[in-house]
Amino acid sequence: MNRPDLVLLHGWGLGPQVWSALTPYLPAGLRVRTPALPGHGGTPARGPTLEAWSDALLPELPDDAVVCGWSLGGLVALDLARRHPHKVARLVLIGTSPCFVTRPENAAAPWPYGLAASTVTGFIDDFAHDPAATLRRFVALQALGDARRRTVSNALNAALANLEQCRPAALGAGLELLADTDWRAALDDVRQPVQLIHGAGDALMPLAAAEWLATRLPDARLARFDDCGHAPFLSHPEDCAVLIEDVVRG
């Protein structure tokens, strides 16, 4: 029986090269695709909705793929699985939360597991004035809480989106997607098996969000890395590759 293709979706402000630490540990012969998100790495920009970003990736996806999304890429992967289930056989979600921003207790649907709205708004405003500095600051947050912080920081900085090849407006739209998206109500529609991978020290998307997600998705399990931040596939690529291979093998 042929193994499915593996599609790796990177996070905001970075490029497909962020997967270069992981791919050497994946099984030989596995077909791996690493498309760029809209507006990243010279790809065309799309509308400011998660659905538009997901649909832009459809030509890159074979049927019945295993889709592995990290951070914003994880939200895109969830949307693909819900709206295009023939494209997504199984999911791997790394450092992914259904809702990036906290919602207050008096909101219709409170959510305590995220960044404060003021922090994210600050990122959006700062990016509009100084994209390069904001990207570097975002990368620094992703490495926090990791025992191999320097290794992670170096890998992330090497994979930073080249602003000369990117569309700043599209990158700004990606930040707004993170700020505005609340995917909790749609989780029951994801019927595919899901492997969650999360760092206990994640400073962007707290572990509690992944723990909540694991209880709400119909078919999910969570692998926790105690000494990791937001990018466990960079600090523990071999361990993450083993988990991904298990998903690919079904």
Swiss-Prot record:
One of its GO terms (biological process) is biotin biosynthetic process. Pfam families: Abhydrolase_1. GO terms for molecular function: pimelyl-[acyl-carrier protein] methyl ester esterase activity. The keyword Cytoplasm applies. Monomer. The physiological role of BioH is to remove the methyl group introduced by BioC when the pimeloyl moiety is complete. It allows to synthesize pimeloyl-ACP via the fatty acid synthetic pathway through the hydrolysis of the ester bonds of pimeloyl-ACP esters. This is Pimeloyl-[acyl-carrier protein] methyl ester esterase.
